[in-house]
Amino acid sequence: MNLEKFIPNKTALITLIAASLVVIISLGIRQTFGLFFFDFEIDLGCTQTEFGFAMGIQLFFWGLFGPLFGLITDKFSGRVAVFIGFLFYLAGIYFLNYGPNTGFWFTFDLGILIGIGLAATAISIPISIVSKHFPLNKRTIAIGVVTAAGSFGYFVSPIYTRFFLLEFGWNPTLLIFGAMILAGLVISLFLNTPMTETKQQNENTQTAMQAIKEAFSNKSYNYLTLGFFVCGWHIALVAT
């Protein structure tokens, strides 16, 4: 494929690269938490049940806050949504490292804060930002690039995380994660919204409740949502 024909403009290219880096950081870190379990068990007294519960809560808040960050994206911009998401993500990593991080607070840090962060930084919001920069005949490929970046994050992050854990321990590894998320905060500033899309947002008078009613009146949307509890939730827990 001719790259010049695929990329509409410089802004689209920058946004595509930024979105890809965002999901590499976000999904990559998320995929490594299972490697920390034995350290959490020894140093924090975390049981398998507590760890599994925290990860389940993380998935729940990931899904619960997705529509809210979608609303923020429509109302303000995807850049704002992802930036806020990385702040929650960073807070979760910070408290997981420095405390409070035992008992309820373990679930709060790993489950709630990081779950909220994932709702904005994982795959949905970055894909929606990128798709607005590309015409329909090229949009699928652009989305595929971002999705592939997320898969790359899944693949490579357990490798370097295992190395860091063996060489430095879990606390320094979480510090490295914090530095990566700080980089993600900077990268999120390069997620641009097309001017035409901004004008359409300003002209859109649909309220959040109207959008929710419209979504739940669509059978396909309801089936897709129910399907998550069969596939997405279980697969994510198994992968962890």
Predicted regions and their residues:
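Flexible cytoplasmic inter-helical loops of multi-pass small-molecule transporters
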Residues: 192-211
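Extracytoplasmic
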Residues: 14-48, 66-69, 238-240
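Extracytoplasmic gate region of multi-pass secondary transporters
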Residues: 33-37, 219-240
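Central cavity-lining transmembrane alpha-helices of secondary-active solute carriers
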Residues: 56-71
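Intracellular juxtamembrane helix-capping segments at the cytosolic ends
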Residues: 40, 120-134
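Helix-loop-helix hairpin linking two adjacent transmembrane segments in secondary transporters
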Residues: 146-196
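C-terminal ends and interior cores of transmembrane alpha-helices
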Residues: 87-101
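Hydrophobic core of transmembrane alpha-helices in multi-pass small-molecule transporters
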Residues: 103-121, 229
